Amino acid sequence: MNRMSEKQIQNSLFEYKFIDFNGPLDTLCVLIKQKRLDINNLDILELSKQYVNFVNQLIKTIDIDILGDHLAMASYLLELKTRMLMPTVDEKQIMSIEEDRQNLIDRLIEYNGYKNLSEHLKQRFEFRATMMDLPQQDYEQFYLKDAIYKPLPNHLDSMILKNIMDKIIYENELKNYKINKIKVHEYDVKQLEQLLLNYLKQSPNQQASMLSFFDIQAVIDKNKRFFAIMFLIILILINRNEILFEELDNDYLLKINIERVVDDYNSSSVEQAKNLTSNLTKDTIINFKGEDNE
């Protein structure tokens, strides 16, 4: 049996369709997953056996063009299997067989990566399709004339805070993109404040990034209201100088201010947080399809 050239392998056997992934490589990846084979230490003999059995079952049902690709891959696997089974002492031939085997493994790993990426992009596309774009609005009309507006504590960058908030809400909603309506869940401000401080106290050097704190929060009973309240609590703690911050790349490093933290929380500060969070809407609606999981 004549060996197939490297160029033939690259041009025919390893082609894939970006959306459907219906071809020889996709079949091999499915077989590897079903048989729980180690793709990094692939047993070519077992894989070729499983693949040939699959092609034999497929011959009478599959389109002739697609079948041709599968037959070419089956032929290549049988050739590689035969070369591996034949005894040889030629080091160059042994190295050639191992190179071909490793080339197949590398192609499968690369293909599987593209496949996973395609599935991720598909999920992102479906999630984005559930959202609606609004034109830029002027929010000054919603400002209360008799309210006292204070600047952000210690000159925090509002754009960084916005990026963090957008990222947190987006990732949370991506995990729950089938939710249609989020019911109101009441949060205890004092407990949430304690939750944050305990997390920082237990972190190395009593410091952690804002994103890492939100990442470890359980999805259950967490919605936009929760994240808005937590953001206000963080700002209040910074304003009270109970936690310090350091700017990172689109994030903030929060650190316990040991000199100011006390176990008995100031009730007036807690009341301040409650007053701020009470202005949050109580009928939060997210434009997602499905049922509520809270």
Swiss-Prot record:
GO biological process assignments: cell division; chromosome segregation; DNA replication
Gene3D superfamilies cross-referenced by the UniProt entry: 6.10.250.2410
Keyword Cell cycle among UniProt keywords: yes
Disulfide bonds: none
Signal peptide, first to last residue: none
One GO CC term, this protein: cytoplasm
A Pfam family that the UniProt record links to this protein: SMC_ScpA
Subcellular location: Cytoplasm
InterPro entries documented for this protein: ScpA (IPR003768)
UniProt entry tagged with the keyword Nucleotide-binding: no
Keywords: Cell cycle, Cell division, Chromosome partition, Cytoplasm
Source species, domain of life: Bacteria
Family: Belongs to the ScpA family.
Its job: Participates in chromosomal partition during cell division. May act via the formation of a condensin-like complex containing Smc and ScpB that pull DNA away from mid-cell into both cell halves.
Subunit structure: Component of a cohesin-like complex composed of ScpA, ScpB and the Smc homodimer, in which ScpA and ScpB bind to the head domain of Smc. The presence of the three proteins is required for the association of the complex with DNA.
HAMAP family reported in the protein's UniProt record: ScpA (MF_01805)
Listed name of the protein: Segregation and condensation protein A
Species in which this protein is naturally found: Ureaplasma parvum serovar 3 (strain ATCC 700970)
